[in-house]
UniProtKB/Swiss-Prot annotation:
<dbReference type="InterPro" id="IPR044861">
    <property type="entry name" value="IPNS-like_FE2OG_OXY"/>
</dbReference>
<feature type="binding site">
    <location>
        <position position="304"/>
    </location>
    <ligand>
        <name>Fe cation</name>
    </ligand>
</feature>
<dbReference type="InterPro" id="IPR005123">
    <property type="entry name" value="Oxoglu/Fe-dep_dioxygenase_dom"/>
</dbReference>
<keyword id="KW-0479">Metal-binding</keyword>
<keyword id="KW-0223">Dioxygenase</keyword>
<feature type="binding site">
    <location>
        <position position="318"/>
    </location>
    <ligand>
        <name>2-oxoglutarate</name>
    </ligand>
</feature>
<dbReference type="GO" id="GO:0016706">
    <property type="term" value="F:2-oxoglutarate-dependent dioxygenase activity"/>
</dbReference>
<feature type="binding site">
    <location>
        <position position="230"/>
    </location>
    <ligand>
        <name>Fe cation</name>
    </ligand>
</feature>
<dbReference type="InterPro" id="IPR027443">
    <property type="entry name" value="IPNS-like_sf"/>
</dbReference>
<feature type="domain" description="Fe2OG dioxygenase">
    <location>
        <begin position="203"/>
        <end position="327"/>
    </location>
</feature>
<dbReference type="Pfam" id="PF03171">
    <property type="entry name" value="2OG-FeII_Oxy"/>
</dbReference>
<keyword id="KW-0408">Iron</keyword>
<feature type="binding site">
    <location>
        <position position="232"/>
    </location>
    <ligand>
        <name>Fe cation</name>
    </ligand>
</feature>
<comment type="function">
    <text>2-oxoglutarate-dependent dioxygenase; part of the gene cluster that mediates the biosynthesis of fumigermin that inhibits germination of spores of the inducing S.rapamycinicus, and thus helps the fungus to defend resources in the shared habitat against a bacterial competitor. The partially reducing polyketide synthase fngA alone is sufficient for the production of fumigermin. FgnA catalyzes the condensation of 3 malonyl-CoA units to an acetyl-CoA starter, and 3 methylations to yield fumigermin.</text>
</comment>
<comment type="similarity">
    <text>Belongs to the iron/ascorbate-dependent oxidoreductase family.</text>
</comment>
<dbReference type="InterPro" id="IPR050231">
    <property type="entry name" value="Iron_ascorbate_oxido_reductase"/>
</dbReference>
<keyword id="KW-0560">Oxidoreductase</keyword>
């Protein structure tokens, strides 16, 4: 196979999609002896065409399990986002392992508490200076695109790539709104009920997040849990990843599962978890808590976690690109009116219904900080057989 004038040998041909060679992001094959979850693959082109069967399928998959794979290769808008995500991952692969944490921390987080949409972030650092679990680089969409009251000053190691980050954000917001418009049909809400809450020009806590999960090195203490089980504080997440690590539950009714948004690493039995195998050319899309709230649980925000890569992939760094979409900060967090959405609110939902999206996000991130601190104090360690 020849891609852009370069010969691609047959083993790597499986990592080529829409003419984009991603073989460098797949340094080892996904193992064949682990239990995986089946996610439906939906077509971006068919969603744009308002194909009735595809509209039904996306609604059913967002009801349960709240995850699906979106084929981006059949529409030029999707191919653009795919290429931008690959470019972002390659950039982080070039930069992050070769810089000190002190250098990377020069990209400061937001001064306001409760928002993880800006800056470099790492929780635990090993004696060799490398992150123990993961490191993230976050870009706030509103400020990056010039829609807010302030702009983002990027450090020297990021500023030459501002246009790439901006392009990825714009493409991601377009794709998210295609998904939201499709869900409006299944939910039987007026056109614009969801998309008007997620307009790119309205101030929000939308973000682009670039992640690196360092591979396990010889002699390093084994702890397989990179990020404990949780639900996302978004409306939609659009995730690109190339190595294994993301896990979902085989059943939402597994022992230990609660209605909460977070849980400890040892609360749910190991055999309840299933691996997600990345598929070249697709993005993994998930419903977040905001969409679950706006539909009063007609749509499901699925519990998931991130662990170290399986099998031969274990020693390799894993990179991910995540576009997070949230309602505008001023949007009320009360359920939409529809025959598909129950008007009866439980006490927690009734309290949230008095908040704006911005207030709700700040409240949730504060709880998340306490959860992370408690996990560290308990010194919980997970080792997957």
């Amino acid at each position: 196979m020849t891609v852009n004038g370069k010969d691609i040998d047959s083993p790597n041909a499986q990592y080529v999609a829409a003419g984009i060679d991603m073989s460098d992001l797949f340094p080892a094959p996904f193992p064949t002896n682990v239990k995986t979850v089946h996610l439906e693959t939906l077509s971006l082109a068919k969603l744009l065409q308002r194909d009735e069967d595809e509209l039904r399928r996306i609604y059913e998959n967002c009801k349960d399990p709240g995850f699906f794979q979106l084929d981006l290769t059949d529409d030029e808008q999707g191919v653009q986002l795919l290429q931008d995500a690959v470019d972002c991952a390659r950039l982080m692969k070039q930069l992050l392992p070769n810089m000190s944490v002190e250098e990377k921390r020069m990209y400061k987080q937001h001064s306001r508490v409760g928002v993880y949409s800006k800056g470099y972030q790492v929780y635990d650092v090993l004696p060799n200076g490398q992150p123990k679990y993961n490191e993230t680089v976050n870009f706030p969409m509103t400020e990056m695109l010039g829609y807010g009251d302030s702009t983002v000053d990027l450090p020297d190691w990021l500023s030459p790539h501002r246009e790439l980050f901006q392009r990825t954000m714009r493409s991601g917001n377009k794709i998210a709104n295609i998904v939201l418009a499709a869900l409006e049909v299944g939910l039987q809400v007026p056109r614009g009920a969801l998309t008007d809450a997620h307009r790119i020009q309205d101030p929000s806590d939308d973000f682009l997040r670039l992640l690196r999960y360092p591979g396990l090195q010889p002699g390093q203490p084994r702890d397989d849990l990179c990020f404990p089980a949780h639900k996302d504080f978004t409306s939609l997440g659009i995730l690109f990843t190339w190595l294994g690590g993301l896990q979902l539950l085989a059943s939402a009714s597994a022992p230990g599962v609660t209605s909460g948004t977070m849980t400890g690493p040892l609360d749910i039995a190991e055999d309840a978890w299933r691996w997600v195998q990345p598929v070249p050319g697709t993005a993994i899309v998930n419903v977040g808590n905001a969409l679950e709230i706006l539909t009063n649980k007609a749509l499901t925000s699925g519990l998931h976690r991130v662990v170290r890569a399986p099998g031969e992939q274990l020693p390799f760094d894993r990179y991910s690109v995540l576009v997070g979409t949230r309602p505008a900060n001023s949007f009320p967090m009360k359920p939409l009116q529809s025959p598909q959405i129950s008007p009866v609110l439980d006490p927690a939902a009734a309290e949230i219904a008095t908040m704006t999206s911005g207030q709700w996000g700040t409240h949730n991130i504060g709880s998340f900080n306490n959860w992370v601190k408690a996990r560290t104090e308990r010194q919980e360690v997970l080792i997957i057989p």
